[in-house]
Every structure is written in structure tokens, then in C-alpha cells.
């Protein structure tokens, strides 16, 4: 009897603490991705505590280097941080396409993963994962309608993220 209880406890703990595999888009047109994106929603992060009206701007500096500038408003003041992104290991740039859509971004504290797990065909909406605990829903528009938001949240849910923790910007 104790063995069965122990097995059940181990299975439950494994399910709770298991890490999902973050699957990036198979490719990303780098030029089309450049420019300003508005944060629509995110999973909570310590480095964005209190942030509202967040944006991210991407500028191609070299074929393998992107400047990333993140802005947000905290208590009425604009906070900005600039870093660089480079292709992740096992990622290649072929004819302007990042294959797969995986980068490593550095804001001065070491590199972190940046995986585009969804991009619509018109490059108007994107979902980015920084791993198992960080995620952003981005748009070219500051505001999106509820139907589009719900569709993007469904994609996030289907990727295995807890959508109950999303913070809408």
C-alpha cells in the first residue's frame, strides 16, 4: 500500500515540476520582425514588476546581431533597457530567415533564451517565450480586440502555459 502511495506522490510531483519543451516557430523573417512591438500580456517577471505600456523595439545591427530596446512605464516614469540578441545554438540565418526562431538576448546580465513560438502570417502578432516561466504576447498595435486576444491566449494555453497568471497590459 505504501508503495502505491509513494508512486502516486512521485507521479504528481513529476507532473507539477516537469518542464515543457519550448518549441519555436520553424523560421522567422528577421526584417519583417524588426521594429516596434507592444506588449499585450505577459507572465509575471521580477524585472517587469509594476510595468505598464511596455514596448520592445528590434533593430538589425549586423546579419547576426539585433539591438533590443525594451521600454515600460513605472509610476509615470519611462524605464528603458537596451541589449543585444544573437542566434541561439543550432540556429542559422539563411536568406534573411532565422531557422528556427530562437535567439539569445543579453541585457548585461548574461544571455537568456528568446523563442518566437508564434507569429501570424502578417507579422502583426507574436508570442515569445523566454523559457518555461516567461512569456509575452506582442502586437504591432497598442490595443487589440477581445477576439484576437482570446485567440492568442488559446495558443499560449495550448503551449502548456498557465494562462490564469497572464497580466494584460
Swiss-Prot record:
Gene3D superfamilies: 2.40.128.20. Transmembrane segments: none annotated. One of its GO terms (biological process) is response to stress. Keywords: Secreted, Signal, Transport, Virion. Coiled coil: none annotated. It is found in: Secreted; Virion. Residues 1-18 form the signal peptide. One of its GO terms (cellular component) is virion component. SUPFAM superfamilies: Lipocalins. PANTHER family: APOLIPOPROTEIN D. Could play a role in the transport of a small ligand. Belongs to the calycin superfamily. Lipocalin family. This is Putative lipocalin R877.
Amino acid at each position: 500500500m505504501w508503495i502505491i502511495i509513494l508512486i502516486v506522490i512521485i507521479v504528481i510531483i513529476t507532473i507539477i515540476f516537469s518542464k515543457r519543451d519550448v518549441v519555436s516557430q520553424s523560421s522567422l523573417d528577421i526584417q519583417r520582425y524588426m521594429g516596434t512591438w507592444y506588449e499585450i500580456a505577459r507572465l509575471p517577471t521580477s524585472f517587469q514588476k509594476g510595468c505598464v505600456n511596455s514596448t520592445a523595439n528590434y533593430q538589425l545591427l549586423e546579419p547576426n546581431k539585433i539591438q533590443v530596446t525594451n521600454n515600460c512605464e513605472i509610476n509615470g516614469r519611462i524605464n528603458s533597457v537596451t541589449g543585444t540578441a544573437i542566434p541561439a545554438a543550432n540556429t542559422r540565418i539563411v536568406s534573411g530567415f532565422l531557422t528556427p526562431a530562437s535567439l539569445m538576448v543579453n541585457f548585461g546580465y548574461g544571455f537568456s533564451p528568446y523563442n518566437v513560438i508564434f507569429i501570424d502570417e502578417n507579422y502583426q502578432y507574436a508570442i515569445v517565450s523566454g523559457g518555461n516561466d516567461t512569456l509575452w504576447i506582442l502586437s504591432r498595435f497598442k490595443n487589440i480586440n477581445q477576439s484576437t486576444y482570446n485567440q492568442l491566449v488559446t495558443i499560449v494555453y495550448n503551449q502548456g502555459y498557465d494562462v490564469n497568471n497572464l497580466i494584460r497590459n
